[in-house]
Amino acid sequence: LLFPSSAAAPGEFPDQWIHGSKSAMDNTDPPVQVHRYNDHTYILRENKAINYEGAFMYVFFGNGVALLIDQGSTSSPALFPLREVVDELIANWEAEFDQSSTHLIVANSHLHGDHYAAWNQFVDRENTTMVGLTHEEVMHYWGFSNYPDERLEFDLGGRNFVITGTPGHQSS
């Protein structure tokens, strides 16, 4: 697969995100909303009836590799089956684009619990790299030596990303 790097990847946002219900018992929405932004990018949303944060997560695909950014606010696979959803996305993407054995990288935008609660669902997954849950592990994985001033290029199977530190409410 070829991924042009000269421009942003075009895509479509949904008309509406699920919002859950006042009570999880009355909720009829799926625990994870899956939106295909484009052929190789998915935006996931945690149902707000499961956790008020309603976390967003992202899955990016490149040749032979996928990157999951963030794992939501709920650790329980029974309530929030994120790994099941991600595994199904990978299987469907592989079938559509004649790929196999896609390696998964599990990373976080920053290290707050509402972004990595379902991390535990992936720790025993084969063919998976867990970037880490400490500032030091994250800096080492991406290769930062002058964070946050440095901008690094990351090759996700022929799909190039720029990794950079940004001001926010968490150091990594």
Please identify what each model-predicted range represents.
Residues 2-27:
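N-terminal low-complexity, Pro/Thr/Ser-rich intrinsically disordered segments
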Residues 3-4, 31, 98, 143:
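Short, flexible coil/linker elements and helix-boundary hinge sites characteristic
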Residues 4, 32-34, 41, 104, ...:
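Generic structural motif
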Residues 28-33, 150:
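Intrinsically disordered, low-complexity boundary segments flanking structured domains
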Residues 31-93:
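Conserved beta-strand hairpin/beta-sheet module of binuclear metal-dependent hydrolase folds
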Residues 44, 148, 166:
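Hydrophobic residues at beta-strand termini and immediately following loops
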Residues 74-163:
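Active-site HxH/HxHxD metal-binding segment of metal-dependent hydrolases
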Residues 167-172:
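Active-site-proximal loop/helix segments of hydrolase catalytic cores
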